[in-house]
Amino acid sequence: MLNYEISGKGNENLVMLHGFMENLMIWEDLEARLSNDFTLIKIDLPGHGLSKMYAEIHSMELMAEEVKKVTDQLGLKNFHLLGHSMGGYVSLAFAELFSDDLKSLTLFFSTYFADDDEKKEQRQKSLRIIKEAFPTYVSAGIPNLFNPNEKDTLEGKMNFAKKIALSTKNEGVLAAVKGMIERT
């Protein structure tokens, strides 16, 4: 079973799926803003945070099926699903497989479009770099996720994101990249 945390006191349930090289801690800022209106279910995706590995390749569908096990265990129906980046890809797979469970679907910095050939090639290259120099991959890549005009004011958030990324299991990162390459 995937690791998850529940917080908030709202009448509606919001399941939150983090992005690549993140974990449920990434939602701290939003948690304070949403916890009066929603009961928040923050989930660590496979190979991230405290969740275990499930396969050599974590397809978006595999991850969605593991999320479904959590929502079933909690008896959730008619809930809101929020996905950030890769969590958005997982959310889309969840919506395809289990649409009857959802009240709404929200994507942050994600897309329903599959990767084009250029993006798939970038992901293939990243596999090698992750295997050979994961800390360098994190140090170089995380700042690119932030607005370049605000890097000075967002330095604390960038360092937080780097810390979370570096705590992610290397095998989990590789399995997620392979899953994103396969995404259609």
Range-by-range predicted roles:
Residues 5-56, 60, 70:
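Conserved HGGG/HGGXW glycine-rich cap/lid loop of the alpha/beta-hydrolase fold
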Residues 2, 38, 100-103:
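A structural micro-motif
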Residues 33, 76-116:
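Conserved hydrolase catalytic core segment
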Residues 114-121, 132-184:
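Conserved alpha/beta-hydrolase catalytic His-Asp/Glu region
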Residues 30, 59, 63-66, 137, ...:
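Hydrophobic alpha-helical packing elements
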Residues 61-79:
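Conserved acidic catalytic loop of the alpha/beta-hydrolase fold
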Residues 36, 58, 74-77, 100, ...:
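Structured loop/turn residues at beta-strand edges in well-structured enzyme cores
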Residues 13, 23-26, 104, 164, ...:
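Residue-level recognition of specific faces of alpha-helices
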